Amino acid sequence: MKTIYISGPITDLTTGQPREGWQQDFLDAEAKLRRMGFSVINPVDIAREVEDEYLCNWEYLQLTKEPKQPSRADYIMACLNRMKVCDRYGRLDGVYVIGEHIAALMSHGVQMEILMADVLGLPIYAECRDGLRVDRGLIPIEGHGKIEELLKD
């Protein structure tokens, strides 16, 4: 099965806090990709797994009587680790690649995910909502494959 990791803006770069509505954006993208026949690795699910792991850390709970809170690095590392099982990388609208350079206005997490996709040799695809119908799905970034390659097994 075709497995795609979806990436997109989570952090509001002006506040440093999670962007309002980020989870719904990822869930909508996942639903669309599943309809296209993909197995999807979604950061929303990874975040829940990380939080569950920390809530179930009984040693820490016994010592402190409070659950340990995951750090930003914990979330990012978990996402990067899960990318290793994917054969495609899809970026949501709002993540920009300019030529071979990652745009400076992206969060550290997205920058690292794009670099990891490159290291793993994953084709990088971009979702585009501006000027295209939503059901058009994913389009490739210039130089990173063709839509036919994305859709074939």
Label each region the model flagged.
Residues 1-153:
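Conserved catalytic or regulatory cores that recognize and/or transform ribose-phosphate-containing ligands
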